[in-house]
From Swiss-Prot:
<keyword id="KW-0648">Protein biosynthesis</keyword>
<dbReference type="GO" id="GO:0043022">
    <property type="term" value="F:ribosome binding"/>
</dbReference>
<feature type="compositionally biased region" description="Acidic residues">
    <location>
        <begin position="205"/>
        <end position="226"/>
    </location>
</feature>
<dbReference type="Pfam" id="PF05198">
    <property type="entry name" value="IF3_N"/>
</dbReference>
<comment type="similarity">
    <text>Belongs to the IF-3 family.</text>
</comment>
<dbReference type="InterPro" id="IPR019815">
    <property type="entry name" value="Translation_initiation_fac_3_C"/>
</dbReference>
<dbReference type="InterPro" id="IPR019814">
    <property type="entry name" value="Translation_initiation_fac_3_N"/>
</dbReference>
<dbReference type="InterPro" id="IPR036788">
    <property type="entry name" value="T_IF-3_C_sf"/>
</dbReference>
<dbReference type="GO" id="GO:0032790">
    <property type="term" value="P:ribosome disassembly"/>
</dbReference>
<keyword id="KW-0963">Cytoplasm</keyword>
<protein>
    <recommendedName>
        <fullName>Translation initiation factor IF-3</fullName>
    </recommendedName>
</protein>
<comment type="subunit">
    <text>Monomer.</text>
</comment>
<comment type="function">
    <text>IF-3 binds to the 30S ribosomal subunit and shifts the equilibrium between 70S ribosomes and their 50S and 30S subunits in favor of the free subunits, thus enhancing the availability of 30S subunits on which protein synthesis initiation begins.</text>
</comment>
<feature type="region of interest" description="Disordered">
    <location>
        <begin position="195"/>
        <end position="226"/>
    </location>
</feature>
<dbReference type="GO" id="GO:0016020">
    <property type="term" value="C:membrane"/>
</dbReference>
<dbReference type="InterPro" id="IPR036787">
    <property type="entry name" value="T_IF-3_N_sf"/>
</dbReference>
<dbReference type="InterPro" id="IPR001288">
    <property type="entry name" value="Translation_initiation_fac_3"/>
</dbReference>
Length: 226
């Protein structure tokens, strides 16, 4: 399976600068924390005298709030911030296995063991309970199965929300929990049971969807060098 493609774009400044600021007056915040409302033309002149740019940081304020900064350095910092965020992103795969409300114990144990393994490897998983034909009248059995899955997978994961019906399918999502996984691995390492690999899933049983997970995301306003 191909890895999800991460596109790299140049930082886009969404704030107006210099001549783009066309309101009659602005509130300028200085590096020492003081602020002053002044005509925009005067603020632009002050920026030029400092060899800096007048940058609007709060366009919806009345009047808009601006600061003095170096536009080139600001764009560089924004680019660096975007690259740092991309480094913290990691490609993961949503793994889905399908069940039926009358799934037998052997099939349940087999598929749940695979879901557990996917979670231990850091993947998000989705258990889909499919109601064929008139079996949709047995919704309670599907919900029962969802609770059994939740209990079994709770040692390595947290359920993401409540089970959700969409048509004749019941979806249950689980997110890996690193602390639980670490504890589980430590306990398992202390046992003397030999490692037995799971039998492979049949291709029609497993559905995979690429996802991009970010460890940190923020929409910070332009930073100041000062």
């Amino acid at each position: 399976m191909k890895k999800p493609k991460v596109t790299t774009q140049k930082p886009k400044l969404t704030y107006r600068v210099n001549e783009q600021i066309r309101v009659p007056e602005v509130r300028v915040i200085f590096t020492d924390g003081t602020q002053k409302v002044m005509p925009t033309l005067e603020a632009r002149r002050m920026a030029e005298e400092r060899n800096q740019d007048l940058i609007e940081v709060q366009p919806n304020a009345a009047p808009p709030v601006c600061k003095f900064d170096n536009l080139g350095k600001l764009l560089y910092k924004m680019d660096k911030r975007d690259k740092d965020l991309k480094k913290k992103q990691k490609a993961t795969t949503l793994k889905e296995l399908r069940f039926h409300p009358n799934t037998d114990k052997h099939d349940f144990d087999f598929k749940t063991a695979h879901l557990e393994e996917f979670l231990r490897k850091g993947n998000r998983v989705r258990a889909t309970i499919v109601f064929l034909g008139r079996s949709i009248i047995y919704k309670d059995k599907g919900l029962e199965l969802a609770e059994r899955l939740t209990e079994r997978l709770s040692i390595v994961s947290n359920r993401d929300g409540d089970p959700k019906f969409e048509g004749k399918k019941l979806f249950v999502y689980f997110d890996p929990d690193k602390k639980k996984i670490d504890t589980y691995e430590r306990i398992k390492a202390k046992t003397s049971q030999p490692f037995v690999p799971l039998a492979p899933l049949s291709p029609e049983d497993l559905i995979e969807e690429p996802e991009l997970e970010s460890e940190s995301d923020s929409d910070a306003e332009p930073e100041s060098d000062n």
